[in-house]
């Protein structure tokens, strides 16, 4: 009831962690809107330090954070019973593993360096079985060590680090100029393109040139269509006729 009375008497945005008015100290840490839009940076930093989360549980946006180690480290932080048990289990497994590896190595060296007939085949087989089962135990214990060490490491980091939350940067939306981009065809280099004109286009150009020459005055010649065809043939023959090179009289080949 007291929290509801406080929320009803507050005007403006409310921090979703402490349920108090944010004021000018609030930040927008993620893409959430509405009641989860603004939060106190101190409240969110404390929550992230304890929970060791890196993203918002609602919008799944990763927080922009900066982690700093405290100047005075707390080597033995306050822990619950389960955490104390996990720490004790971790230390016991590590000590047992080191002692077992040392004993197995020492026994193996003794067997290898002992003279022939010192140990019976049964004793050697028993040692090998014990060593194999012990290695299996070490493998499974190593998995438990990794799991417990992760919990202990998170607890140690939560008590000796400070997380600072930075404001959220919303993705930049494209502007109107970027949406209305038009593609333009680039013109080739000066001097024309490499494509050759087709036969149809060349014939059309020749025909248009003939029409311009024949119909410039607007009147047909006296000879009629046959004369025009003859003129076109003559013009084409003159244009296509090869040019003769001048012959030099004083050239030695010509004199011979």
Swiss-Prot record:
Q: Which InterPro entries match?
A: Znf_RING, Znf_RING-CH, Znf_RING/FYVE/PHD
Q: How does it sit in the membrane?
A: Multi-pass membrane protein
Reaction(s) catalyzed by this protein?
Answer: S-ubiquitinyl-[E2 ubiquitin-conjugating enzyme]-L-cysteine + [acceptor protein]-L-lysine = [E2 ubiquitin-conjugating enzyme]-L-cysteine + N(6)-ubiquitinyl-[acceptor protein]-L-lysine
User: Is this entry keyworded Metal-binding?
Assistant: yes
Report the domain of life of the source organism. Answer: Viruses
- Identify the residue ranges that face the Cytoplasmic compartment according to the record: 1-83, 146-256
Report RING-CH-type zinc finger ranges: 7-66
Q: Which residues bind Zn(2+) 1?
A: 15, 18, 40, 43
**Annotated region Disordered: where?**
179-256
Residues bound to Zn(2+) 2 are 30, 32, 56, 59
Its Enzyme Commission number(s) read: 2.3.2.27
The chain's coiled-coil residues are none
Molecular function terms, GO-annotated:
transferase activity; zinc ion binding
Kindly state which keywords UniProt assigns to this record, in alphabetical order: Early protein, Host cell membrane, Host endoplasmic reticulum, Host membrane, Host-virus interaction, Inhibition of host innate immune response by virus, Inhibition of host interferon receptors by virus, Inhibition of host interferon signaling pathway by virus, Interferon antiviral system evasion, Membrane, Metal-binding, Transferase, Transmembrane, Transmembrane helix, Ubl conjugation pathway, Viral immunoevasion, Zinc, Zinc-finger
SUPFAM superfamilies, sorted: RING/U-box
Gene3D superfamilies the UniProt entry points to = Zinc/RING finger domain, C3HC4 (zinc finger)
Q: How does it assemble?
A: Binds human MHC-I, CD86, ICAM1 and CD1D.
What does it do? Membrane-bound E3 ubiquitin ligase expressed at the immediate early stage of viral reactivation to mediate polyubiquitination of various host membrane proteins related to the immune response. Promotes ubiquitination and subsequent degradation of host MHC-I, CD86, DC-SIGN and DC-SIGNR, ICAM1 and CD1D molecules, presumably to prevent lysis of infected cells by cytotoxic T-lymphocytes and NK cell.
PANTHER family from the xrefs? E3 UBIQUITIN-PROTEIN LIGASE MARCH 2/3 FAMILY MEMBER, FI20425P1
Q: What is this protein called?
A: E3 ubiquitin-protein ligase MIR2
- Gene designation: K5
